[in-house]
């Protein structure tokens, strides 16, 4: 009943994009033809998903970016997460501090014990029961409703749960997981500058289920149990944005009473999900999965070889960007990925603790 009430009284959705604008040589140029609109969007998003290549670790003379792309150098990756990796003196200072912090976290968590991932039929059923059936479709046309129907069959549920378990253990994802559909939304109504649009990625439903199982549940639980999440993140269960705001006000009041100099900076992490570096992120995941490389490689392969098609007011595009043949493989987590919010918390926890310990 509440669903029907909310659906009736809530604000209408932003319409699908039919035109975009770009600033070319200081002038605003508008595109209204389908091919031009799709090309402008794809060129912008291709740049967004390659921003993480500017991270110093990718340009290191040590070749860490290439060696750890799919955690190919297993020995080096495990040395970093166990704190036994010798960090060269010529490595960029911020990168060196982050690697040391990952090693400190690894010494606390990684124990060489059982790190198997098993997707049980009960967990699979519980996940799909909670989801909204009316979530937008991915490219394959398989959506949440298909899986919500499938969980009513006992054998089908067992097979689908076992499929995710096999994928996590083998590190080999289905080809369909590397095809995505992208929708652009206006952040500000009427403003259609392509760099001001929010990109939402629609992934395969079972890929998002996999991400939820690995990153949102198991990895996040490990991070919480280790008490590693700094209180600044306010990600504890029961905490709200209001709690964080009141805490900031209290902190400023205490600083004023103690006459202690203090600065509060509001910094927007622009394109934060789109520019997450996979080398650093994969090392954090590796720690929190107790060294389970295949489960992480599955996600990395899909995200780095993802081929994105575009959905606009004209329909779905025939052209795409990304894929295996791109000069700079794509990084980032993608909005619409169920692993993105918890992964951002996990990465932020490492960054905040790096600052605290230095």
Task: List the predicted regions and their residue ranges.
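Short, intrinsically disordered, charge-balanced linker/junction segments flanking boundaries
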Residues: 355-358
């Amino acid at each position: 009943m509440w669903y029907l009430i909310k659906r009736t009284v809530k604000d209408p959705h932003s319409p699908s994009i039919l035109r975009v604008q770009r600033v070319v040589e200081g002038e605003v140029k508008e595109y209204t033809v389908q091919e031009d609109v799709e090309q402008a969007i794809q060129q912008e998003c291709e740049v967004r998903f390659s921003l993480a290549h500017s991270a110093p670790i990718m340009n290191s003379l040590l070749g860490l970016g290439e060696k750890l792309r799919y955690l190919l150098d297993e020995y080096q990756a495990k040395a970093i997460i166990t704190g036994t990796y010798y960090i060269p003196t010529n490595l960029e200072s911020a990168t060196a501090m982050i690697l040391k912090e990952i090693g400190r976290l690894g010494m606390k968590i990684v124990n060489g014990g059982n790190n198997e991932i098993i997707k049980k039929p009960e967990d699979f059923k519980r996940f799909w029961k909670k989801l909204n059936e009316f979530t937008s479709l991915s490219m394959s046309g398989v959506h949440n409703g298909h899986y919500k129907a499938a969980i009513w069959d006992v054998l089908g549920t067992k097979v689908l749960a076992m499929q995710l378990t096999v994928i996590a253990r083998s590190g080999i994802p289905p080809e369909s997981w590397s095809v995505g559909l992208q929708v652009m939304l206006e952040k500000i109504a009427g403003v259609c500058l392509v760099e001001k649009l929010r990109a939402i990625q629609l992934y395969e439903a079972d890929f998002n289920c996999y991400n939820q199982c690995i990153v949102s549940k198991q990895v996040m639980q490990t991070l919480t149990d280790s008490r590693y999440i700094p209180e600044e993140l306010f990600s504890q269960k029961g905490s709200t944005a209001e709690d964080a705001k009141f805490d900031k006000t209290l902190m400023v009041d205490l600083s004023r009473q103690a006459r202690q100099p203090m600065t509060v900076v509001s910094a927007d992490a622009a394109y934060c999900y789109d520019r997450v570096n996979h080398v650093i992120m994969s090392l954090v995941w590796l720690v929190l999965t107790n060294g389970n490389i295949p489960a992480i490689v599955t996600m990395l392969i899909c995200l780095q070889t993802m081929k994105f098609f575009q959905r606009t007011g004209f329909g779905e595009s025939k052209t795409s960007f990304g894929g295996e043949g791109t000069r700079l493989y794509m990084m980032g987590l993608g909005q619409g990925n169920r692993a993105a919010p918890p992964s951002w918390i996990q990465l932020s926890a490492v960054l905040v603790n790096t600052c605290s310990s230095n």
